């Protein structure tokens, strides 16, 4: 159990090796933890608003965060210093490094008279001058705002999940939409996470389902049904398992007994779509989930401001569907 945030967690992410766990919350300060023993290594101090998203590059050298103070910041992971701070005209909802680490993408909210926009920036030689540079690509979103985002293979495309349940793939060379999923989801998408090999990704939606999609065609492969909105979903890197977390919207939560099972992490079989386990822990909805890259543990961040790291016991790895 990692205690270091004063307000609800918005996103958690492991680095590629899995030794570091990054968390951001509505209390303005992203944290980094040593995932093995839960020791807090440091905080990234500099935002003036709720931090909505973060991502770390492959080499664990740079961290990107987007916040409600209308800035995207790039940090030095080791020293905690700000490399660049990029202003925008509304709050930043998603931010991701590309696989190569040469580029980063972020999206802004549709608010204060501003439309939602997707930006791509070159971060190879990132320094304070990045704030004045024009982004390499800027795509205005005319329909629904972006709520989550992934990079496609070879840094050629970006997959966006929207507030109306749509998913789209954008070709960043042409700057236009190449695939649209249509309306597989009937309500907003809260989270999208790729599988380890990048061939498919799982979505978490307010329509109470999580779905598995093909990364290239956006064909819906599987559906995992629950009774309440799903805030986050992640795919195990070693087994055919998906974990879902959610609960009601923060506004609708009353102090209910945890026995009601509303705030459990729920494990589904990737292929059979069957729920096989639930893990308790949080005193409120789960906002973000992440599997450790070795698949032997997972972390969850909740509305209660805690990050919980749970290690699986040996029985988890025995195939229960034989």
Swiss-Prot record:
Ranges: WD repeats: 4-43, 46-85, 141-180, 184-223, 281-322
Compartment(s): Cytoplasm
Matching HAMAP family: eIF3i
Example GO BP: formation of cytoplasmic translation initiation complex
Task performed by this protein: Component of the eukaryotic translation initiation factor 3 (eIF-3) complex, which is involved in protein synthesis of a specialized repertoire of mRNAs and, together with other initiation factors, stimulates binding of mRNA and methionyl-tRNAi to the 40S ribosome. The eIF-3 complex specifically targets and initiates translation of a subset of mRNAs involved in cell proliferation.
GO cellular component: eukaryotic 43S preinitiation complex; eukaryotic 48S preinitiation complex; eukaryotic translation initiation factor 3 complex, eIF3m
Name of this chain's protein: Eukaryotic translation initiation factor 3 subunit I
SMART domains: WD40 (SM00320)
One Pfam family, short name: EIF3I
Assembly with partners or alone: Component of the eukaryotic translation initiation factor 3 (eIF-3) complex. The eIF-3 complex interacts with pix.
Keyword RNA-binding on entry: no
Family (UniProt): Belongs to the eIF-3 subunit I family.
Domain of life: Eukaryota
Key words of the record: Cytoplasm, Initiation factor, Protein biosynthesis, Repeat, WD repeat
Species of origin: Drosophila ananassae
Keyword Repeat recorded: yes
Annotated TM spans: none
Any one GO MF annotation of this record: RNA binding
SUPFAM superfamilies linked to this entry: WD40 repeat-like (SSF50978)
Broad class of where this protein is predominantly found: cytoplasm
InterPro entries: eIF3i, WD40/YVTN_repeat-like_dom_sf, WD40_repeat_CS, WD40_repeat_dom_sf, WD40_rpt
């Amino acid at each position: 159990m990692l205690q270091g945030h004063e307000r609800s967690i918005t996103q958690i992410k492991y680095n590629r090796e899995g030794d570091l766990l990054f968390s951001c919350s509505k209390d303005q300060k992203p944290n980094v933890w040593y995932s093995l023993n839960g020791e807090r290594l440091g905080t990234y101090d500099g935002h003036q608003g709720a931090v909505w998203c973060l991502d770390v590059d492959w080499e664990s050298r740079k961290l990107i965060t987007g916040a409600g103070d209308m800035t995207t910041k790039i940090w030095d992971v080791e020293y905690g210093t700000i490399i660049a701070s990029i202003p925008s005209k509304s709050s930043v909802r998603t931010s991701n490094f590309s696989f190569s680490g040469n580029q980063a993408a972020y999206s802004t909210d549709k608010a204060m008279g501003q439309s939602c926009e997707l930006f791509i920036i070159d971060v190879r030689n990132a320094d304070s001058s990045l704030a004045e540079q024009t982004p390499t690509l800027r795509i205005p979103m005319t329909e629904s705002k972006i709520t989550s985002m992934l990079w496609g293979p070879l840094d050629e495309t970006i997959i966006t999940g929207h507030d109306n349940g749509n998913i789209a793939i954008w070709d960043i060379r042409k700057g236009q939409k190449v695939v649209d999923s249509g309306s597989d989801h009937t309500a907003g998408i809260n989270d999208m996470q790729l599988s380890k090999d990048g061939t498919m990704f799982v979505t978490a939606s307010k329509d109470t389902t999580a779905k598995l999609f093909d990364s290239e065609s956006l064909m819906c492969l599987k559906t995992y049904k629950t009774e309440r909105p799903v805030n986050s979903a992640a795919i195990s890197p070693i087994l055919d398992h998906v974990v879902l977390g959610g609960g009601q919207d923060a506004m609708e939560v009353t102090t209910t007994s945890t026995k009601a099972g509303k705030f459990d992490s729920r494990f589904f079989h990737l292929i059979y779509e069957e729920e096989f386990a639930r893990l308790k822990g949080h005193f409120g909805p789960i906002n973000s989930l992440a599997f450790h890259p070795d698949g032997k543990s997972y972390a969850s961040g909740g509305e209660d401001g805690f990050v919980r790291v749970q290690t699986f016991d040996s029985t988890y790895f025995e195939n229960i569907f034989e």
